[in-house]
A protein has these predicted regions:
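Short active-site segment of divalent metal-dependent hydrolases/proteases
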Residues: 16, 206, 336
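Catalytic pocket-lining loop regions of alpha/beta-barrel enzymes
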Residues: 120, 133-141, 146, 151-152, ...
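Active-site-proximal gating segment of KS-fold condensing enzymes and close homologs
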Residues: 116-132
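Short glycine/proline-rich turn/loop motifs
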Residues: 62-77, 107-112, 225-233, 304
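Active-site flanking residues adjacent to catalytic metal/cofactor-binding acidic residues
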Residues: 10-12, 202, 264, 332
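Mid-to-C-terminal alpha-helical segments outside catalytic/metal-binding sites
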Residues: 2-10, 19-69, 73-97, 127-135, ...
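Divalent metal-dependent hydrolysis catalytic cores, especially in the metallo-beta-lactamase
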Residues: 70-78, 88-112, 139-147, 167-174
């Protein structure tokens, strides 16, 4: 049996929960009256009030996280706001480094009508997240938040994030007004990211503000569903497929050949199908995409594109064979309801689809290259986690 104890494990999509943080003190005084207000809906779900609207809607078309769940659904953990607790949970799971996305504000801010408010909130969240990561800067790495509906402000925030040490910045799958990510309005963002050498990470979302067709954070097809289960199943992979398609088709990767973009939390199994389907459409409909200079599959197989897998996902061997062994990265999704804490790393290690070398690429090598990570910690978490798996401490944490 292969020994993974000395393998560095990098989680490329973990989450904090900035919705539980009072951001008002981090906002300029004139904006503090518009700071997010935390509240509970009738089911006890956490929601925020922004721009006079509740995010996300709990009922109606395209609801956010809501409805009954089984005991296997994971709950909120203190590590999402407390970095010391987070580091302990990382040891339980076998994670040496975690790349951290926001949740409630991060997945909302690009749906706001006011680009100015979005800009202020991005800075407030970024400053809090950087402070969170300072608890152990080798192990906790921040994903910056930028106001994409205000591209020039987003450029300034990217420059701030690069100097502050963020390893990537989050892109939504679309922004307020339902602008897709291949739109030329976002070129200043892509130009800046390429110049800085900073990769961008597209992260989908579910839920919206109750105004279908207006909010930029409603997933594809969500307005047709009144149950969260259908919204979640479709929004995450479909929105990534759309964002990737539009960015490729509108020539983003050709205009910016050194730009690197990750597509997070939508699984990986769909990638060979999507590349093949896109190539087929180009053979017959290329005149409709004059800015596309290469076959879509060529771009998807290049170092410009990567994505994350689900820890329990099967069939990754087919993705590696069809695309590249340097395309897919491990992600825990800690600690959202659908994550597999504290067993996501164990899922990868125990999986039968991939060789040891392929799993090592999945767990660290692809992430190191994509995010250009330096100053790596010593691999140690898996040794600790293995003990917790064997002595039952991991199960106790899962049941807590």
């Amino acid at each position: 049996m292969d020994n993974f104890d000395n393998v560095l494990v990098i989680d490329t999509d973990g989450h904090v929960y900035e919705g539980n943080v009072d951001l008002s003190s981090r906002m300029p005084e004139k904006w503090r009256s518009q700071a997010p207000i935390r509240l509970k809906d009738n089911e006890g779900n956490s929601r925020i009030l922004l721009e006079g609207r509740i995010w996300s809607a709990s009922q109606g078309p395209g609801p956010g996280v809501s409805g009954p769940m089984t005991e296997k659904a994971r709950g909120y953990r203190p590590g999402m706001v407390d970095p010391v607790a987070r580091l302990k949970d990382m040891d339980l799971e076998g994670i040496d480094m975690a790349i951290l996305f926001g949740t409630q504000i991060a997945l909302t801010v690009n749906g706001l009508m006011s680009g100015e408010l979005a800009t202020v909130l991005c800075r407030a969240v970024n400053e809090w997240l950087l402070e969170y990561c300072s608890a152990d800067p080798k192990r906790l790495l921040g994903v910056g938040l930028i106001p994409c509906q205000a591209p020039q402000a987003a450029v300034k925030e990217l420059e701030f994030l690069a100097k502050a040490g963020a390893v990537t910045a989050m892109l939504p799958t679309n922004v307020y007004g339902l602008k897709n990510m291949g739109d030329r309005m976002f070129d200043p963002i892509y130009d800046c990211a390429q110049s800085l050498g900073m990769p961008l990470s597209v992260h989908p979302q579910t839920g919206h503000d109750g105004v279908p067709g207006v909010s930029g954070v409603m997933g594809a097809g969500s307005e047709r569903f009144f149950k969260y289960v259908y919204v979640h199943m479709t929004a995450f992979p479909f929105e990534l497929m759309i964002a990737m398609m539009h960015m490729i088709g509108e020539g983003v990767f050709d205009r910016y050949p050194k730009l690197r973009v990750g597509f997070m939390e939508g699984g990986a199994g769909w990638l060979p199908f999507w590349a093949e389907r896109f190539d087929e459409h180009i053979e017959k409909l290329a005149p409709q995409m004059p800015d596309l200079k290469r076959r879509p599959s060529e771009i998807i197989k290049s170092e410009q594109v990567t994505l994350t897998c689900e820890s329990e996902e099967t069939g990754l061997d087919r993705v590696f064979a069809a695309n590249s062994e340097n395309t897919v990265m491990y992600a825990s999704d800690y600690c959202h309801w659908d994550c597999h804490f504290p067993y996501s790393v164990k899922d990868i290690i125990d999986g039968r689809d991939l060789s040891f070398a392929q799993k090592e690429k999945l767990l660290n090598k692809t992430a190191i290259d994509f995010f250009q990570l330096k100053n790596l910690p010593q691999a140690n978490a898996l040794k600790i986690a293995r003990q917790s798996w064997e002595n039952g401490n991991a199960q106790k944490a899962a049941n807590a």
